[in-house]
Amino acid sequence: MEQVVRHMYLGTLSDLRGSNLIKVITGARRIGKSTLLEQHHAALKAKIPEASVLSINFDEPGYRFLAEKGWKEVYDFIVGAIRPQEMNYVFLDEIQNIRQFEKLLEGLFVHPKIDLYVTGSNACFLSSELATLLTGRQFEINILPFSFPEYLEIAGGKENADRAFVNYVMAGGFPEAVKFAKVGEHYSFQYLQSVYKSIYQNDIKARYGIHSDISYQDVVNFLADSAGSPVSPGNIARVLTNSGKKIDNKSVAKYISTLTDSYLFYRAARYDIKGKQLLATQEKYYAVDTGLRNAILGKEPYGDSGHLLENVVFLELLRRKNQVWIGKVGTCEVDFVARAADGDTKYIQVSQSVKNPETLARELAPFDKIPDHNEKILITADYENCSRNGVRQINIVDWLLS
């Protein structure tokens, strides 16, 4: 399959080359972390042909013998394989497979001739222990599935972007899923189901000691079906228990934590716009990919279009390097508060359609209560781009391609 060059992520890696930081590439399995390392390797060689590069994927059969050894043996192997008189670029893929990998990273970090890049599929490898060892020494680059423009590079359909967007929401942006969707949607669907099962078996069940597959799947389904709705462990436990699926708050909280640690879901906390503070309750969770979400639920997304649009917008805001929260202003909710690194803040509402006057009034109402003059945007699937009392209304496809 033709590769999509992930320019934004590659640009970050290029900017950080030679810095005294461990470049930590995170994201769900099969999302393209290894491919990104390969692309960075190629870009590095193109820029510095004589560069010394050592690349190890601990998931590959040829290197699994290392995963079975202690961290010190792996360290000795790596140091013995590099050129001691020059800078070496060391790429370690799926580092969490090494026991006590944090000690391995600490040892390699202080080596004067190593510029270190690592990937991992589970957030526990950014745990408190590693954070303590490497405080201020790491830079995380979290990889998300293909954006809509990246999807179009592979799937085609630029001449009919609206139709392509429907397919994008259906199949999502996992690289291989996009490839399979070109053959048939059901192939993409089956592939994504296998991805989820693999993540559950390899990254979640054994690692976290999940004893009830059924209870776990109940929570996953609830979270996937509730994307864009406020939830809490207590609320989920209560609803499931009332439907005959008994589970306690503690188990639900644990399960949700495993899903975010595995990058299957992302949490959006609530933010009090007037009080300028984060709130501790009723956060929302969004799936890492709409196609994966559809595959988990085992259904096509008809009837869920509003929440799916919201999910797409949330992920795109993250791609654009924003901090993203759910806004609260008085008794009203703003779908997203997005703040860029330079402090630029936007307030965003997302709706499938605002052709109904009542729907339009409901979507605009929270903006009227916001006391500042930051940009306010209403994103819809309607074919109408306009300004309404200082609120910019824009079509979802136009926004994604802008």
Where in this protein do the model-derived segments appear?
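Pre-Walker A adenine-sensing motif
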Residues: 2-18
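Hydrophobic anchor at the beta1->P-loop junction of P-loop NTPases
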Residues: 25
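Conserved lysine of the Walker
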Residues: 33
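Hydrophobic positions on the alpha1 helix immediately C-terminal to the Walker A/P-loop
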Residues: 36, 40
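Conserved catalytic segments around the Walker B and adjacent sensor/switch elements
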Residues: 45-61
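Short glycine-rich substrate-engagement loop in P-loop NTPases that contacts/grips substrate
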Residues: 56-85
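Interdomain motor-coupling "hinge/lid" segment immediately C-terminal to the ATP-binding subdomain
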Residues: 121-123, 128-230, 263
